[in-house]
Amino acid sequence: MNLKISFLKSKYILAIVSLTTFLSANETNHIETIYLGSGCFWGAEKGYESLNGVIDAESGYANGYGVKPNYRSIIQFKNKYNENNFAEVVKVTFNSNAISLEDILKHFFETHDPTQLNRQGNDIGTQYR
């Protein structure tokens, strides 16, 4: 009797795992990533995370060298206008079945001014390019 119960439990667990694996594999076929620099990454990250279909938004740094890619190094006064400074960016991971790249880019252009060089509003420095 114990063996049969154990077998039935295993059978159901296997069925659930298989269904979950199938759904997860199907959903991940539509996972895409884009890196966007739209000024200070803290506010940008929060804005992207609020969009339905965005799975994750993660702050980071891109396109620099000669400066340590960490917050303290990047915001130092000596790096404020350093052309080699890293830019603050957000890595946006999204499900393209739930939100289009066009919608993400629409949000991108609505929330920052691409005509401002090395600044976004009151934030000034090459990290905001």
Describe each region flagged by the PLM.
Residues 3-7, 24-129:
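Flexible coil/turn and secondary-structure edge motifs
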Residues 10-21:
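Bacterial N-terminal signal peptides
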